[in-house]
Structure formats: C-alpha cells, structure tokens
C-alpha cells in the first residue's frame, strides 16, 4: 500500500495526577456527583473534579492527594486479601441514593445497585470490580484533618495545634476562616476558654500555637476537646469538626500526628488517627489480630475442674460484717459486706437452700459457680472471690462493683448517645465472645445485669441462667430468660444455641440507643406475639449504621442473625457502627469510659436502687424442718476459693 502524507491534529498528553497508583484526570460531570473521599457534593462548572482512569474513583480536586488506599487496578497489597471482601447483594432503594465509589446516582426503579451486608456501602453493579477491598474500614475524611501534639506533664495538659488540611468550604467563596477551640469536657464554666487565631480565607490553615491546660485529680475522667470553627462577621460561627482525647489516656501515652475531624457527637468521644497508607494499616491490624488470637488461646484455656479450698482458706459467714442490701429477687438477695479486720468490700449473693431445692435449681446454682470460677476471664465479667455454705444457705462472695447498672443509668439519662452505646456494646461483646468460646450460653443479658465499675467499665453479672457445653451445632430447648429479651426461637420452643445471646444483645443495644424496648405488649402473650411476628420500628434520629446493626441482631431467623455464622465474632467487629472502636485497646481496658460513676466513699451505695439499699441486711428464717431433712450431698463441691482473685481496696 502506498504511503501518503495526510493532515493530522496535534496531540497533547493530559495532565495525569498519580496518587497511590490512582491516575486522576480532571473531568466534567454531566450529572450530580458526590466526592468519594469527603462525601460532599462536587460543585462548579467545567471540570469540577478528578476521576481515576483505572478504577473510576471520583473525588474533589482538593481531596485527591488525601486518598489513602492503593488503586484496585494496581492492587497487590493487603487490600486484595479475601478477608476484607465486601458482601455485596442486589438492593432496591426507596429514595435517591448515590454510589459510594463513583459518586453518581444509582438509577432505576428496582435493584438499582449493590449494598454491602457488613459496612452498608452502596455501589453500581459496574463499580463492584473497582471497589477497594476495605470492608470494615473507613477511608473517608468528611471534614478534613488536623495535625496536633498532646501530652500530660504533671498537673498540666500541653497541646500544640500545628495545622489543618482539606477543611470543608464554609463561605460562598469556597473557603473558610477557621480557628480552634481548646477545652476540657464536660466543660467547666470557671475554666479559661482557649482558642487559636483565626486564619482568613483558607482550607489549609497553619496555626503553630501551643496551649497549657491546668488539671487536677478530678479531671482524669474528662476529655481534652479540640473543635474547629468557621468565623463569621455577621452571623453565628459555624462548626467545622472536632476530636477529643481522654485525659487518663494522655497520661499513659502522648499523641502526635494527623487526626480526622469528626462531627460533634463523635468528636465528643473519639480521636481517630489518619492513616495515609491504609494498606500498611490493615497489614498491621491483621498482624495484631493474629497475635491477639494466639494470646487469647493461651489466655482462655479449656475449663478444668476447679480445686476445692484447703483448710487454711476456709471462708465463713462470721468473717463478714453485712452492711447494706444491694438487690433482691426470687433467688435471694445480694448484700454489701466488709471482711472483718480489713478494708475489703464484697458483694455477697445469698441463696436459700430450701428455695433452690423446691424450685429444682440445684444444677443452675452449680453452673453459676462453675462459670464464675472459670480461669483467665476477660475483665468484663464479675470476679468471684469464693463460695461457701452453711446448713441452710449458699454464699457467692464476689467483687463489689459500685457504679450501679445500665438500667439505673438509662433511667437517669433517657438514652445514650451512639458513641456511648458503642463503647458499652463493645465491652459486653468481649464478655459474650469469651463465654461462647467456653461453650456457655448466657441467656440472661439485660440492662439490669450489666454493671459499671468505679472507672466506668462494664461488668456482666448474674450467671444463674447459663447453659454449659453448647459447642458447635449443639443446642438446648429450655424456656428461660427475661420476657423483653427472649429470642423468637425460645418463644416458639425451638432448639437454640448462642443465637439467643445475640438477640438479647440486639434488644439491649436498641434500648441503649432508643431509650425504650423494641417490643411491647399489655401482657406476656402479647409481648411474645410481638417478638415473633412484628417488625421493629426505628427512631429517625438513629444513624443508618446503628439501624443496620440492630436489624442484623434482631433478625428472627437464627441462622441469618448477625453473630451466629462461622465468623460471628469477625462479622460483629466489622460492622460500620463499630468503626471507631479499637478492639484491641477495648480488650485491655485502655479506652477511657465515656462516663465515670459518682462515688462519694468506699461504702457508697447511691448508685443502687433505694428500694433495696434502705432495707436492713437481715437474714430471713428458713423452713427448719425442711432443712433438717435436706440431703446436703446435693451441694457437695460448692465451696471454693478463687486463686486468681485480685483484691481492690
């Protein structure tokens, strides 16, 4: 073929911006589009944003340099690990919804897109192959980031506010006038207000200012709050983002680096570090989880038969001064007691043998003792000091948990903010995970049985309803539990396993978030009908992450219920509701609780119901004739002293 000279137009290579193997090009969007990094709308005319030519990720021009994951088109790191796969399923949306990857509308009437069962991510079917495998992690920065240093030295908190990047535009010119407020929360009006200078017309302000906040011992349960605000000359200043750190956490370890700015509710309880390379972060988390699983195997060995006490360790009722009734019920009563000759305080649960025999509860009592005596328990289960018996009674000597229970707190506050509920739910979950690994179904999880210690950490109490040896597919059929928390399979007399605990966990979580039970009825029959047949309605104030978690836990079919699958623990920890939760630190009690109970003195019982504490700790008489004819062998092996018990004075 003869070659000829022809006219051709000139070429110019487009300006490609490479970030973490993404190849971003400026682009004009013909339809409304949202940024996948900050979740804000992409405004303007012309080429308003950037789109990756490999994976189609869409971001603002100002956001592209902060994308923290490797482009899936070039992905060879931990983002490719199957353990971080999204669980996408076809979904029909009832209201306009935008793709969390490319930012454009999920169009159509039915099955418009895919929704992840675990993290609630919404994407187009065409985008699924390009989505990074980061299920359970949050790679977005909705309000920008701030660089700070914080430490406690003596009685002073030292804070350095250095700079911020990629803040939200707040003014008509697309910029903002940011400044930072520094304070302790809960806020004391008598303390000095501290704030930085205002940087005019900037989304990337540099302050480089230092502050000192005086603290006393009473401030250790408070949090250092940093809030970024936009200054306005004519109207109220606008909130831009915040974060906070527990003073007790800063005392243990200073903080330094970039942190995400959060909304007001989250910022009151969290300080989330920015991970510029989320790939490395995931690798580090996985190695920690691997080490944690190895250590947990050592920490939680198979339960063995407990050793009975030696003669020199014998504990008697005469060793204690009984002070105040803390609670009572059909089982007997719980009394605050002081060990004679010491400052040691204990909560002693006293049960009548005649009532136990008549109610056929001997085995339940022995199970409760064996569960309390399990070795190497996590710190979120009540500790047992010892068990002993007299001719007519059984005594459980346990640690005194003096912060009251969650029922008392809910009655005081009405309901909890979501970060508070997430903290309590995470600590409760650690306790349930342990019990389930031991083959124990708890069966009586409720607000009344979740106590708060002096620091504000939770303690699960009352193991009288537990069922042992429920491993794998093994089930039981006993009808038991507290009516409001009973799972549908118990109501329907179906065989069940640990699934009933996750149902009760869902009910408890709903009560913490909504301040009311999810099911109700005039009587038990109506209540049980509601549990088996009715759907739960959720307050509009709840976030979609909270609703998604509650729906997963309150699924009526046990096999489909969250937490009941082969990877139940991972499924719960990976939920979007728990994204800010650092599980490893939660397990080690390193996270400062959101609330510290008010305790006036060692023997203070003001956090317990006055109906009980006003009662004298008298021992009520038993049926002497019945006791004389009682076979005491029924309770052989009950007496026990815990060699692992740690005395706290």
Swiss-Prot record:
Ca(2+) 2 binds at residues 171, 230, 232, 238. Ca(2+) 1 binds at residues 171, 177, 230, 232. Its EC number is 2.7.11.13. Its main location: cytoplasm. Ca(2+) 3 binds at residues 232, 235, 238. It catalyses: L-seryl-[protein] + ATP = O-phospho-L-seryl-[protein] + ADP + H(+); L-threonyl-[protein] + ATP = O-phospho-L-threonyl-[protein] + ADP + H(+). The keyword GTP-binding does not apply. One of its GO terms (cellular component) is cytoplasm. ATP binds at residues 326-334, 349. Residues 579-649 form the AGC-kinase C-terminal domain. A zinc finger (Phorbol-ester/DAG-type) spans 21-71, 85-135. One of its GO terms (molecular function) is zinc ion binding. The active site is at 444 (proton acceptor). SMART domains: C1, C2, S_TK_X, S_TKc. Belongs to the protein kinase superfamily. AGC Ser/Thr protein kinase family. PKC subfamily. This is calcium-dependent, phospholipid-dependent, serine- and threonine-specific enzyme. Activation of PKC by serotonin results in presynaptic facilitation of depressed sensory-to-motor neuron synapses, which is thought to underlie behavioral dishabituation. PKC is activated by diacylglycerol which in turn phosphorylates a range of cellular proteins. PKC also serves as the receptor for phorbol esters, a class of tumor promoters. This is Calcium-dependent protein kinase C. It comes from Aplysia californica.
